[in-house]
Amino acid sequence: MKRFLLCSFALVLLYPAGIDMYLVGLPRIAADLNASEAQLHIAFSVYLAGMATAMLFAGKIADQSGRKPVAIVGAIVFMMASLLCSRASEGSLFLSGRFLQGVGAGGCYVVAFAILRDTLDEHRRAKVLSLLNGITCIVPVLAPVMGHLIMLRFPWQSLFYTMSTMGIMVGLLSLFILRETRPARLAPRDLSPSSSAAESLVNRFFVSRLAITTLSVSVILTFVNASPVLLMEVMGFSRGDYAITMALTAGVSMVVSFSTPFALGLFKPRTLMLVSQGLFLTAGVTLSLAHTNTVTLFGLTLICAGFSVGFGVAMSQALGPFSLRAGVASSTLGIAQVCGSSLWIWLAAILGISAMNMLIGILIGCSIVSILLIFSVAPNRSVAEHEEIPYQSRS
């Protein structure tokens, strides 16, 4: 079991590392490529577009050919794309590399969740996904610090050499440590009507959890995207103050994420999901009424706590019905989360909504819609039946 957890954690970490590692070098990258920082900020959206593109195909391929091949190919693509970024001499080539980085990270991300669905029951999966969320929160703290230390002595290209090395390490783990977890496919005659209905992507319960997780990811990505404007322009923080504040909020996320597995032993998953959305709603109201930096920071802290306590539980519930189509389900969740959050951020920018109002709007909208879905759509009885994997591959 430890090998599956190790490999899943490593596969997931490529995604946030690809976002956060290079940001500290953005001014120098822009200068060397004769591009403005504003032009290169589109690299974030390009990276997410690459992830979404990979997710369109990775899940189905993982269900048909296995988790291991997709993980290996994803790591190789991430490694080679990182090298392409390091060799870029102009903006378009750099953005192409960022897109391919997203493709590699997206494939690995999908496989990681499919592996956890294959190997863990619902109760353990919810705990592990909460821990995974906590570990993921470490990356936004450590990656900029690591990037800063690297750039004290080396050029910005070294940031992408580091990411390339990460891709190599994940590829080696996938090749030599990871075992195939894809369950053996049942013949059509062996699939009962209830099984087919439960593993349908238009299943009412799955759609509700897809909506909840997509809205939750939209909240946290809106926070990350808006945080430089909120903290440095609106609140007047220096770059150092901004880094410290983001480190503290990430610390809150880690503490709550690592505490959630213990909370699951005391409370029902639905209770934690309601607490999560309650924290989002409280954060939205707090930010809308805030007149001091202290109150605003308290509201931002509630966002991190709310996401950490509920996201892993909701993801576990969403994957629960899928024993044979975990890859496709994981892809669908990833695509919805990436595209949904990107659409909201893009739409808010087009409409000229301020960073604060953008954040308040998604917080209140997410909490109201999610609370209604949690109360109105309960887990199907058949979900528990599909927690068991019919046949486990030993390859």
UniProtKB/Swiss-Prot annotation:
Keywords associated with the record: Cell inner membrane, Cell membrane, Membrane, Transmembrane, Transmembrane helix, Transport
Organism the protein comes from: Salmonella typhi
Topological domains annotated Periplasmic: 25-41, 90-92, 152-157, 238-246, 292-294, 354-357
InterPro entries with a match to the protein in the record: MFS, MFS_dom, MFS_trans_sf, Multidrug-R_MdtL
Gene Ontology annotations for the cellular component aspect, listed alphabetically: plasma membrane
Cell location: Cell inner membrane
Membership in a protein family: Belongs to the major facilitator superfamily. DHA1 family. MdtL (TC 2.A.1.2.22) subfamily.
Membrane-spanning segments: 4-24, 42-62, 69-89, 93-113, 131-151, 158-178, 217-237, 247-267, 271-291, 295-315, 333-353, 358-378
Name the record gives this protein: Multidrug resistance protein MdtL
Topology of this chain in the membrane: Multi-pass membrane protein
